[in-house]
């Protein structure tokens, strides 16, 4: 179980030129009060848009909206611990890996400390380049490792691929990439990229959030768990691959009558004790491309329903 004060870390991976930096800049522009900490190996490797920068010193860049960018150099874990010890702690840490880094190795390092946990690994691929990269004997192993360790795969630069391109058929028949989300200019809702933010989780807004919906690529629904649901079993059920859920987050009343926060992203799930009293309910997000509500109801029926 995740500690109640542990900070979530999203690892961004992807080969050189896939669109990682653009994804970071988009996240900063969409933060809307969420305090993000961007962690990079060297400042020179991340081109933060100038209009987002408020101040800069040797170790930290102050950004609009209370966000910050830090360089971790040779000691990533020390930098993570320093972020968690700030008086004004970030809500979420985004760690941009280098283009040739293996994200599962970064995740293993993060697991050595209790102050943070890996919330998700997001891998970006370049729609135009991915087939050539997977056939390149020098880089294929790296690209495959980045893809296989991902909870969410963003297939970027989709606007450059024609509708009749063989890429689409190749993607759908690929064992892993068939779940990739097509995006352009690394533009994706923050709900999808980082998870549903803390601002949405009051009793008065949980249903409004799901009703609001997303772009035409996604659906969202509120799931109402029964009383005294086992949070571990529910979190495991949410990661069933045939449900094609992108993310789920919410609260349940456990068998011990305590309130637990339950989250899932891709094949990853985790639970923690809620630090405040919350009403039971989860928001589920999936892609319309793989929408099957009959299958969803069947997979989750022992835990609750989609009507109050």
Q: What is the role of each PLM region?
A:
Residues 284:
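Flexible loop/N-cap segments at domain edges
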């Amino acid at each position: 179980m995740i500690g109640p004060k542990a900070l979530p870390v999203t690892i961004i991976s992807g080969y050189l030129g896939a669109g990682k930096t653009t994804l970071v800049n988009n996240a900063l522009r969409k933060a809307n009060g969420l305090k993000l900490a961007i962690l990079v190996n060297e400042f020179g490797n991340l081109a933060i848009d100038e209009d987002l920068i408020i101040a800069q010193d040797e170790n930290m860049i102050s950004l609009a909206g209370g966000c910050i960018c830090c360089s971790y150099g040779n000691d990533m874990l020390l930098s993570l611990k320093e972020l968690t010890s700030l008086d004004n702690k970030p809500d979420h840490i985004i760690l941009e890996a280098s283009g040739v880094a293996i994200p599962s190795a970064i995740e293993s390092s993060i697991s050595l400390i209790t102050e943070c946990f890996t919330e998700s690994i997001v891998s970006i691929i370049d729609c135009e380049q991915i087939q050539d990269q997977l056939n390149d004997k020098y880089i294929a192993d790296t690209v495959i490792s980045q893809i296989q360790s991902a909870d969410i795969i963003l297939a970027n630069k989709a606007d450059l691929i024609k509708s009749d391109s063989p890429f689409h058929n190749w993607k759908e028949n690929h064992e892993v990439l068939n779940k990739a989300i097509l995006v352009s200019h690394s533009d994706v809702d923050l709900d999808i990229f980082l998870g549903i933010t803390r601002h949405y989780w009051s009793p008065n807004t949980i249903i409004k959030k799901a009703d609001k919906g997303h772009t035409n690529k996604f659906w969202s629904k509120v799931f109402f768990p029964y009383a005294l649901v086992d949070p571990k079993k529910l979190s495991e059920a949410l990661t069933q691959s045939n449900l094609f859920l992108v993310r789920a987050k919410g609260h349940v009343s456990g068998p011990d009558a305590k309130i637990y926060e339950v989250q899932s992203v891709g094949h990853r799930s985790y639970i923690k004790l809620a630090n405040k009293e919350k009403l039971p309910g989860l928001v589920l997000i999936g892609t319309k491309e793989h929408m099957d509500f009959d299958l969803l109801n069947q997979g989750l029926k022992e835990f609750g329903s989609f009507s109050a």
